[in-house]
């Protein structure tokens, strides 16, 4: 199994290969929202708590191209991450 591409809170760009999973590190995974400018290139999954563990938001690299992920924190501040998929 290939490990996910980890995107830290200070990164504004990331590279991934088709099929890679993305793990977006945030302070508050459950209350942070992530959107993708192109869900056909990078799909996103929101952070969650399943009762036994808390998971960061993440995504999946679906096809070659570029998508901008917008991370909206609980205080409504945002940051963007440009993900290039090859």
Identify the meaning behind each predicted range.
Residues 1-86:
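Extracytoplasmic soluble-region selector
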């Amino acid at each position: 199994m290939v490990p996910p591409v980890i995107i830290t809170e200070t990164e504004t760009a990331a590279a991934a290969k088709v099929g890679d999973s993305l793990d977006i590190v945030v302070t508050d995974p459950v209350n942070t929202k992530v959107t993708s400018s192109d869900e056909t290139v990078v799909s996103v999954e929101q952070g969650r708590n399943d009762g036994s563990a808390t998971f960061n938001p993440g995504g999946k690299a679906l096809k070659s191209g570029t998508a901008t992920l917008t991370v909206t924190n609980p205080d409504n501040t945002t940051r963007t991450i440009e993900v290039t998929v090859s």
